Amino acid sequence: GTAKADPMTVSSWGDLIQYLAWSFPLVGAMMILTWRLSNVMIDGAPVISGWPLYAVYGVLTLVYVAHVAKTLEINVPILKAGVPEEDKYHWGSVAALNSTYFANFGAELAVVSMLPMFFENTFSQLQSSEGNYIMTATLSGVIAASFAFVNLLARPLGGLLSDTMKNRKRTMLTYMVGIAFGFLGMASIGQYGEVVDGQQMIVPMFDGTLWLVIAVVITILCSMFVQGAEGATFAVIPMIKKDMTGQIAGMAGAYGNVGAGVYLVIYSLVDAKTFFYIIAAGAALSFVYCFFALEEPSDAFAEEMF
C-alpha cells in the first residue's frame, strides 16, 4: 500500500500544477528564514554566511526537487489512466484553506511573539493618578496571553458556527473579513510618534487608561476572529475528500507555520503598526482567494440535502 507520507494524488493536470506550486512555499519559508539569518550580525559577522548558507539553500532546493519527482511519479500514471469521477475532488479548496491557515494561525503565532513588546513600548509612558507607570513587563505579558487564551473558546466556536450556519464557505469568508478588520483595529491602537535613535516610536492613539482598556478589547475581539477562523478551516478540511483528510490537514497545518515564519521575517523589517496592516492585507487576500477557489463541500450537510 501507499504510505501516507507520499505526496497527494490529484484529479487533473491543472490540479497537479497547483499542488506543485503550493508545495514550494513549504520549502521557500525556510529559505526566507535562512536569508534573514544571513543578514543578522553578531560581533560584526553574519550568523550564517559563505558555504554553509549556500549548503542550506542547496539542501532545501533538493528537498523540493525530490518532492516534485515523487509527485510526478505517483500522479502522472494516474492522470494518464484517467481519474474515476467518484475519486475526483476540488484541489482549489485545498489551496484556499492553505491560504486561510497561513493568514490566521500564521498571524496568531507571529502576533503572540511580538504583542508583549508592542504593548510595553506603546503604553510605556502611561501613568496612574498617583504618577506610577502602569505598563509593566508583567502586565504586557498578561495582555498578550489573553490573545492566546481566547483559543479555548474561539476555535471550537469557529467549528460550531461552521456546523450550524449551514454554509461552510460563508462562515470561512466571514471570519477572514473579521480578521482583516481586527488587525486594522490593532493597527489603530497606536500612532506614529517621534523618531528616537533612528527608530520610529509608536504612541497610544488617545491618552488615558480608558484607551488601554479599549486596546485590550480590540486585541481580544481580533483574537476571536483569528482563532475562530482556525476552527472554521478545520471544519471544512474533512469535507474535501474523506480518505485524504490527514494529508490535506497536514498541508494546511504546515501553512500555518509558513505564515508565522513569513510574518516574523516581515516584522523584523517594519514597525508594529505597518506589521498589523500587512497581516490585515494577508487576511484580505485570503478572503479573495477563498471567494473564488473554495467550493462549498457538496455533502457537508448530507442529511439535510438528501
What are these model-derived regions, one by one?
Residues 190, 280-306:
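Multi-pass alpha-helical transporter architecture, strongest
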Residues 163-177:
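Cytoplasmic membrane-interface "Motif A"-like loop-to-helix N-cap segments
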Residues 177-208:
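C-terminal ends and interior cores of transmembrane alpha-helices
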Residues 241-271:
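A late C-terminal transmembrane helix in Major Facilitator Superfamily
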Residues 226-241:
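Intracellular juxtamembrane helix-capping segments at the cytosolic ends
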Residues 148-156, 257, 261:
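Residue-level signature of mid-helix packing/kink "hotspots" within the transmembrane helices
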Residues 19-28, 49-66, 274-292:
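Symmetry-related core transmembrane helices of the 12-TM Major Facilitator Superfamily/SLC fold
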Residues 23-54, 92-145, 230:
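Extracytoplasmic gate region of multi-pass secondary transporters
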